[in-house]
Amino acid sequence: LTQKLKLTGSVLVSTPQDIALIDVVRGLKMFEKTNVPIYGIIENMSYFVAPDTGKEYQLYGESKTEAIAEKYDYELLAKIPHDPLLMEQCEKGHPLTDLFPEHKVSQMFIEMAEDILKKIKLNKLSETT
């Protein structure tokens, strides 16, 4: 599919589990081989924040996503927490960023989107020069 379409770029999304990160590495290698720009990696369901204490819990053990990003020289764009409000709004088909723009996770998504757009613009500029 990547050979038939002219892709603007890619963002790889993974959970912190080792098995999921194997797929990320495969994806990185495939996009590199097909010359599709890689704008970064996102770790989804990275941790859970206890609402009563604010303490972070690693649901899947110690993450290796950061090490993978460093090894292959790509930015880790964000570590998105396992958030009940995000899950609830996704199930309803409502973007969290629209309904709760000040929520911490909404802010993470907004910052990621802005960062990715900047990278796309820089990539487009470098293609024209």
Where do the model's predicted regions map?
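Conserved catalytic-core segment of NTP-binding enzymes
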Residues: 1-89
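Residue-level detector of alpha-helical recognition elements and their boundaries
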Residues: 25, 39, 101, 124-127
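Glycine/charge-rich, flexible interdomain linkers and switch-proximal surface loops
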Residues: 45-46, 126-129
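C-terminal boundary of histidine-terminating zinc-finger modules
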Residues: 92-105
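Short, amphipathic alpha-helical "lid/cap" segments that border enzyme active or binding sites
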Residues: 102-114
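Short, hydrophobic alpha-helical segments
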Residues: 113-125
